[in-house]
């Protein structure tokens, strides 16, 4: 092959790879653009220009394929229940105590729960994400078939959000999954649940802890948080009947009275009519069993993972007082 031919081939391959990393000419993109124009009155030329700038990211596709929730509990738990994160949580709670108490008064959600959510999500705002949200949602919406429908819906919500809030969609940063700000709200959550908690005339969950705190509390309240009620209880079992209750469902469906028919009971005393879900967490050897009540289910509405919700609960418990090595030891 002549040098000139090789050069042309290399340039062609490079150009092809660049074009393949963009999506503006994709038929699905053009359908999406058409829908946004028809449904929401967007300008076609502006959307096409935006997509010309958007990039499909292999890094994002790799990141979403290996979430922390894929780890077993005994490996997942130490990521969040460790001294440094607990210390930072106590500092955050103390620094924003008045705002957190105001949020509790208005929404009924304890300060330590709000703090723990923010601690798990962004290490108290220290790691809110450096990905362009538009790139994340374009990548996952058009190039991740497993959850493409969901991320296309979030892309729609993101474009509506940036128009409503007068944001430049090219400058908004977030996680590899398109979650944004101190509390890591996805676009639909921002539009539905974010609040201007300090009443300064704008909602800013990136730089304003008050709005982040109020938004988390509002999210929990709107999803059914029960003020003053327990989140979980340790479970004890007799026989093997309990095993048929262990599945991937998260919502409590059986009362404690009904659970007792399967040999399941709470270690601590609770009202027999309370509904609970039996949960299993993998240890290095064996498992530990818990009962998740309505408030536990509410936490899973923030992230649909039983491990995530337990990490939030245990981090909140630690922030509220217990030391890291005292928070429900794995070998109990």
Each PLM stretch: what is its role?
Residues 47-69, 118-122, 132-135, 234-242:
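Acidic helix-start/capping segments at beta-turn-to-alpha-helix junctions
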Residues 276-332:
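C-terminal functional modules
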Residues 55, 121-125, 179, 238, ...:
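Solvent-exposed loop/turn segments at secondary-structure junctions
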Residues 169, 173-284:
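Flexible, glycine-rich surface segments
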